[in-house]
Each structure stands twice: as structure tokens, then as C-alpha cells.
């Protein structure tokens, strides 16, 4: 590959002859590969790799693969056998002058030799049939092309076209600023401005391959990055030409839309090509924060960068929440408002009398609005401190008296009790919830009914009277009082005895041995 020190020797005769011989060898290789690819295109399409196209068995394999339905088309004028676009920027810039001289000398000869390429491209892009003759002199040696260039050419171009359709246009000030900063680097190529209309796909392809080789082989990255930037800068002014070419290749975009997903799974390869140039500049513009955009959208300031406080941070009182806390619902009906206030006051422990006075129940709920009803309400509505004393041990008697008073007043009449229950429905529910626990405690503390001493249950019980229904039933079946049960009187004459042990003693306590005082003329169970 040519280095920077080879430039002074270009003007000499030895340098020119050596350069001419090397370039002729390249041209021979190019013609051979072009003939192979043109014959293969007539059978099934372009070859995927330039290195495999030299073998005779590879075209047969590729033709068999094309028959399965995968349609391969190249978006670019340059084909996979044109491998000079993968070189670094240092080698590329060092060969621009001899390549230009060679193009000026042998332009007619190369036009004659590139007829096969022109015939191969006339079906797809008719105006670019003479592009191969003007660009072929820029290619370099065959040993520069490696596997990355040969295998990744068409995939990246397909992906470039698809992402290009989704690219976001840059603002005018940002694009103009980047263009002004890019002009000094491209001044050395001003003599090639006439060929840019036909050579912009070459720069795009060169940029893709250089970026892919950068991710694969470890080498000096500064020159490669510079080369990529320069390629982007060269292709920036040709945006209108690219859009024109893209409209002409719209049918190719439709045919390749199904195969574009194959290139999206290439791991570890970042294709910063012309199609994604708008996205890259957009992200740079957002990173530089020139217009203050949010997520790449101009004119939208994100909420975390706003100077004024947000609405959530002002701590303004919410009228709905305040109305819920205070219990004042302007849209609620009067009965619903009173019921809510009653439940709220009951939760806070407010007496029921105050509840009724503050809530203002409607007249429809008071069926008997008289002094008697109000009197009953006062009697059945204990105040807060009395409620606190209910559960104290010294107030059992007072609580029992209140309980009896409520029971007696409830039994005075059906109508009056119904009106009382209707008027004091909330009060009754409140009293019931308060008295339930105390009643359970009182029942648990009361002594159990029955004899507390040990002995036989019902030992001193009176005999069953003859008017008892059980006694008369047994006599109707043939039983006579004083005899045993059964037809012959041989059954039991006394009821089954039940012995009660003292409290706290289990089964080991000895049973009392006592006999009944009377001959037990009874036949039924003791009462």
C-alpha cells in the first residue's frame, strides 16, 4: 500500500512506471471478476463476496441459494469485487493524486473495458452507466480486501436504505454549522468536485466498510475515525442528489424490505453510514444542548429542566379533598350529608344526641316529631363521660338500670316503638355497638344457674303430676303409676340419676352414696 513517503516519487519515471504496472494488474483482476459477476448475474444475481467469486464452485452454490427465493440486489453502483473502499484514510488520501493522473490518461481505455459493467447496471440505474469508468481508478490492491469487506457489503447498504427513510432532518443552523466546520478538511479534494455526483455512493460504501473494519481488526483508530468523518463531510452536500437517487431506487427498496431484517442482527458492528447520519447528528445536537430539546425534539423543554416549580409542588389546597375532610359536600343531598356526618361523628366518638342535632335529619325520617320522642332520645343517648364509666366495675348497677329502662320503654306499644326505632335508627345502632361488649362481660361474670354443691341432680324434685302430657301418654299405653316401665312393669321405676361434682374436681372425685328419699313414683325426667 502506498505511504506518505511515496508521494515525491510519483513524478519520476520509475514511480510512474511502477504505479502503472501495479494499476494494470488491478485492472486485470477487475476485468476477470467483472466477467465472472456478469455471467453470474445472468444466471441468478450478484455475488455476495469478491474473494469467493474467484472459485468455480461458489457460483453454483450461490445460484442454488438464489433459487430458494432470496433476491439479492446491490443498492450501490460499486459491487462486492470493488474492494478499494475499505482502506484507511491515510492510504486513501495518499493515492488520490496518482489515481487522478491515471484517470486522466486512461479514461478512454477504461471506458472500453468497462462495457460489461455498464451492461450489468443499465437495467437498474440507467444514468449511472458510466460511473464505473470514472471511479475504477480509485481502487487499490487486491490484497487489501479481507473477509469483512466481502461479507458485509450488501447487508450494510440494505440497512442504510431502511434507516435512511426513518432519519430525522437536522435543524438548518446545526447543519450549516457542521458544514462550515467540515469545509477545511475537504479542501484538498476540490479538484474532484466534478466527479462527486457519480462518486457519492463510493464515499458512503467506503465509510461503511471502514467502520466495520474498525470494529473487527485492532489498529490505529485515529486515522480511521478521521476517514469516516471526512466521508460523512463529503457526502453531506450531496443530500439532494441522494434523495433523487433514492426515488429512482424505490422499487429496489420494496423488494429488499423483507430481507433488511437479516442485517439488523449483526452483533458488534456499528454502521455509522449516510443513512443514519441524521440520527447521529440529532443525538450530538441533543447532547450539546444547543436548542434545549427533549429527546431530540426541538422546542420541547423537559420537565426536569424547567425553572418554575411544577403544579404538584405548589401545595395548593384541593377543594375536593378539603370537602371530604370537613364533610361538606355541596353536590350531595341533605339526607346523604346528614348520614355522612353521623358516621363521621360516630367514628370520632361524638354523642348521638349531638349527632342528631347537628345533622338535621329530614322530616320524612321523623314519623312522630313530638316532645315524647325527644324525651326518649334524651334517655337513650348517653353522653361521652357516662359511656366511659360503663365499662368500669363500679357502674354495673347503673348500666343494668339503663338496660331495663330501654327494654320497658320498647314494650309500651307497637306504634310508639316503631316510631321510636325509626327516629333513632342511628342511635340504636350506636347503642348496640357500645353495649355488646359489656353485656358479654356481665354474662360471663354471672354465676351459673343450678346447685353449686355436689350431689344428684334433681334429688329433691317433685313427682310429675298426672295432668302432665307425658304421664297421660304412658298411662294410655298401659303403664300404671308406681310400677316399672314396660308391658309387665319390669322396667325402670326411677329416672336416670345425674351426679354433679364440685367445680374444679375431675373424674377422680368420689361420687356421693345417697339413696332417694321417696320410692319415686315418677316416670319422666325431673324438671
From Swiss-Prot:
InterPro entries xrefs: G_patch_dom (IPR000467), Splicing_assoc_domain (IPR051189)
Compartment annotation: Nucleus speckle; Nucleus, Nucleolus
Main subcellular location of this protein, as a coarse class: nucleus
Region Disordered, residue ranges: 35-135, 175-281, 350-375, 480-527
G-patch domain boundaries: 466-512
One function term, GO molecular function aspect: nucleic acid binding
Ranges of compositional bias, category Basic and acidic residues: 97-116, 186-196, 231-257
PANTHER family, A to Z: G PATCH DOMAIN CONTAINING PROTEIN 2 (PTHR14195)
Protein name: G patch domain-containing protein 2
Gene source species: Mus musculus (Mouse)
Amino acid at each position: 500500500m502506498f505511504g506518505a513517503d511515496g508521494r515525491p516519487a510519483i513524478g519520476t519515471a520509475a514511480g510512474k512506471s511502477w504505479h502503472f504496472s501495479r494499476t494494470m494488474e488491478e485492472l486485470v483482476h477487475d476485468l476477470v471478476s467483472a466477467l465472472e459477476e456478469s455471467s453470474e448475474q445472468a444466471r441468478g444475481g450478484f455475488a455476495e463476496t469478491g474473494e469467493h467469486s474467484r472459485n468455480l464452485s461458489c457460483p453454483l452454490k450461490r445460484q442454488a441459494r438464489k433459487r430458494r427465493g432470496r433476491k439479492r440486489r446491490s443498492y450501490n453502483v460499486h459491487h462486492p469485487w470493488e474492494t478499494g473502499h475499505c482502506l484507511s484514510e491515510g492510504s486513501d488520501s495518499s493515492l488520490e493524486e496518482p489515481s487522478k493522473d491515471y484517470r486522466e490518461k486512461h479514461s478512454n481505455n477504461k471506458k472500453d473495458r468497462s462495457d460489461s459493467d455498464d451492461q450489468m447496471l443499465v437495467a437498474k440505474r440507467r444514468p449511472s452507466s458510466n460511473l464505473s469508468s470514472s471511479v475504477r481508478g480509485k481502487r487499490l490492491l487486491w490484497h487489501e480486501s479481507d473477509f469483512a469487506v466481502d461479507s458485509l457489503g450488501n447487508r450494510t447498504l440494505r440497512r442504510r436504505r431502511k434507516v435512511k427513510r426513518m432519519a430525522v432532518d437536522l435543524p438548518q443552523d446545526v447543519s450549516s454549522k457542521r458544514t462550515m466546520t467540515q469545509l477545511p478538511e475537504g479542501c484538498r479534494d476540490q479538484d474532484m468536485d466534478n466527479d462527486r455526483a457519480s462518486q457519492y455512493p463510493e464515499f458512503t460504501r467506503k465509510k461503511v466498510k471502514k467502520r466495520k473494519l474498525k470494529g473487527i481488526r485492532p489498529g490505529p483508530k485515529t486515522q480511521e475515525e478521521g476517514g469516516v468523518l471526512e466521508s460523512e463531510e463529503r457526502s453531506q452536500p450531496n443530500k439532494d442528489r441522494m434523495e433523487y437517487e433514492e426515488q429512482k431506487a424505490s422499487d429496489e427498496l420494496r423488494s429488499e424490505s423483507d430481507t433488511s431484517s437479516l442485517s439488523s442482527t449483526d452483533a458488534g458492528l456499528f454502521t455509522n453510514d449516510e443513512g443514519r447520519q441524521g440520527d447521529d447528528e440529532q443525538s450530538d445536537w441533543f447532547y450539546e444542548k444547543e436548542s434545549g430539546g427533549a429527546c431530540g425534539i426541538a422546542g420541547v423543554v423537559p420537565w426536569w429542566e424547567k425553572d418554575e416549580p411544577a403544579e404538584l409542588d405548589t401545595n395548593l389546597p384541593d377543594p375536593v379533598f378539603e370537602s371530604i375532610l370537613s364533610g361538606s359536600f355541596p353536590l350531595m343531598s341533605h339526607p346523604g350529608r346528614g348520614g355522612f356526618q353521623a358516621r363521621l361523628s360516630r367514628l370520632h366518638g361524638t354523642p348521638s344526641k349531638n349527632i342528631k342535632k347537628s345533622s338535621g335529619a329530614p322530616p320524612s325520617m321523623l314519623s312522630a316529631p313530638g316532645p315524647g320522642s325527644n324525651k326518649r332520645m334524651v334517655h337513650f343517648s348517653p353522653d361521652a363521660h357516662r359511656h366511659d364509666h360503663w365499662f368500669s366495675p363500679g357502674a354495673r348497677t347503673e348500666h343494668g338500670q339503663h338496660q331495663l329502662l330501654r327494654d320497658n320503654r320498647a314494650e309500651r306499644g307497637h306504634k310508639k316503638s316503631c316510631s321510636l326505632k325509626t327516629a333513632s335508627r342511628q342511635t340504636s345502632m350506636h347503642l348496640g355497638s357500645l353495649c355488646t361488649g359489656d353485656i358479654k362481660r356481665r354474662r360471663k361474670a354471672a354465676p351459673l344457674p343450678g346447685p353449686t354443691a355436689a350431689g344428684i341432680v334433681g334429688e329433691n324434685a317433685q313427682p310429675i303430676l298426672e295432668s302432665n302430657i307425658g304421664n297421660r301418654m304412658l298411662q294410655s299405653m298401659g303403664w300404671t303409676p308406681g310400677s316399672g316401665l314396660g308391658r309387665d312393669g319390669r322396667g325402670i321405676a326411677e329416672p336416670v340419676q345425674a351426679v354433679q361434682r364440685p367445680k374444679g374436681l375431675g373424674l377422680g372425685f368420689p361420687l356421693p352414696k345417697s339413696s332417694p328419699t321417696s320410692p319415686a313414683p315418677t316416670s319422666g325426667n325431673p324438671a
